C-alpha cells in the first residue's frame, strides 16, 4: 500500500487521535524544532508540540518515541579541545537549547514514571537534495548557485559545522526504533568543516566569495559531535563523505 500523509499540528487533538487510531509501535517526532524560530513563542510551541506528542504516545500505549533534537543548540559553545562534543556535555545555548534540554528531561521522566521508552537523537547539520533554502547553509548555497545569485554569509566563514547527509540520518532514525533505551545519542560525522570551505567545494572555487554580513549574535564558532555512542548503541556511523553528499545536492538542482 501507499503512504498517506496527514497535514496536522503535532500538538493538536487530531494528531493525538491519529496516534490512537494507528496504534504504532514507535512514534518518530521530527517536527519539534523548526530551522528558524522567530520568537520566544516559537520556542514555547516547540516544547508544547513535543509534550503533546509524548503524552499522546503514552496515552495510547505506544512503546517508544524517537525524537530529533538540534545538536548545535544543545551543546552551547564547546571549547576547541572538547570537540567533537560528547553526549555528557550538554550546556544549552539560547532559548532553543534550553527547550531542547527540557524535552530531553521530559522524556527521561516519562520513561521512569510511565515506562515510555525513548531515543533522543541529537542531530548535527543535516543536508541533502531538494532541501528548502532556509533549511541550512548547504541548501542556501545551492540555491544561490542554481539561481546565479551571490550568496550571503554571516561572519567571515571561519565558523565550522558538522555536516551529515540526510540518508545517513534516516538510517540512524530507523535503527533507533528498536535499539538503545533512554539515551541521548549524537548523529554526525565528528568532522568540522568551515563554512567558507564549504562554499569553495560547492562552487568549484571559481566563483566570488559570498557577501559578508555581520556575524549573528551568539554565533557558534566551532562545532562537531562525537558519534561513538551511536556506533556502540545503534551500530551506526556516517558513511557519506562531504564531497559525495554535496555532489548529490548539486546534481539534484
Protein language model regions, located:
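Short-chain dehydrogenase/reductase
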Residues: 43-44, 92-104, 131, 135-139, ...
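C-terminal substrate-binding subdomain of Rossmann-fold SDR/epimerase-dehydratase oxidoreductases
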Residues: 145-253
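NAD(P)H-binding glycine-rich loop region in Rossmannoid oxidoreductase-like domains
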Residues: 8-46
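Conserved Rossmann-fold NAD(P)-dependent oxidoreductase catalytic core, especially the SDR/UDP-sugar
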Residues: 29, 51-95
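Active-site Tyr-X1-5-Lys
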Residues: 78-79, 93-122, 145-147
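A conserved pocket-lining segment of Rossmann-fold NAD(P)-dependent short-chain dehydrogenase/reductase
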Residues: 39, 87-93, 118-126, 141-164, ...
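Conserved active-site helix of classical SDR/Rossmann-fold NAD(P)-dependent CH-OH oxidoreductases
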Residues: 50-51, 100-108, 139-142, 171
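Flexible, glycine-rich beta-alpha linker
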Residues: 74-75, 94-95, 119-136
Amino acid at each position: 500500500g501507499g503512504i498517506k500523509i496527514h497535514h496536522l499540528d503535532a500538538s493538536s487533538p487530531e494528531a493525538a487521535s491519529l496516534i490512537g487510531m494507528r496504534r504504532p509501535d514507535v512514534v518518530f517526532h521530527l517536527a519539534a524544532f523548526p530551522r528558524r524560530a522567530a520568537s520566544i513563542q516559537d520556542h514555547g510551541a516547540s516544547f508544547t508540540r513535543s509534550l503533546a506528542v509524548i503524552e499522546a504516545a503514552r496515552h495510547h500505549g505506544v512503546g517508544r518515541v524517537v525524537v530529533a533534537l538540534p545538536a548545535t543548540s544543545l551543546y552551547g559553545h564547546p571549547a576547541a579541545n572538547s570537540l567533537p562534543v560528547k553526549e555528557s556535555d550538554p550546556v544549552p545555548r539560547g532559548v532553543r537549547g534550553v527547550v531542547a534540554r527540557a524535552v530531553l528531561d521530559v522524556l527521561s521522566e516519562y520513561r521512569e514514571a510511565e515506562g515510555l521508552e525513548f531515543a533522543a537523537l541529537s542531530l548535527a547539520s543535516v543536508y541533502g537534495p531538494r532541501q528548502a533554502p532556509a533549511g541550512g547553509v548547504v541548501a542556501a548555497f545551492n540555491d544561490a548557485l542554481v539561481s546565479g545569485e551571490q550568496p550571503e554569509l554571516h561572519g567571515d566563514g571561519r565558523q565550522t559545522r558538522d555536516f551529515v547527509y540526510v540518508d545517513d540520518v534516516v538510517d540512524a532514525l530507523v535503527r533507533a526504533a528498536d535499539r538503545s533505551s533512554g539515551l541521548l545519542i549524537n548523529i554526525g560525522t565528528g568532522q568540522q568543516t568551515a563554512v567558507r570551505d564549504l562554499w569553495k567545494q560547492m562552487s568549484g572555487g571559481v566563483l566570488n566569495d559570498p557577501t559578508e554580513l555581520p556575524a549573528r549574535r551568539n554565533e557558534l564558532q566551532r562545532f562537531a559531535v562525537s558519534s561513538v555512542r551511536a556506533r556502540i548503541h545503534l551500530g551506526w556511523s556516517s558513511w557519506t563523505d562531504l564531497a559525495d553528499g554535496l555532489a548529490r545536492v548539486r546534481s539534484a538542482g
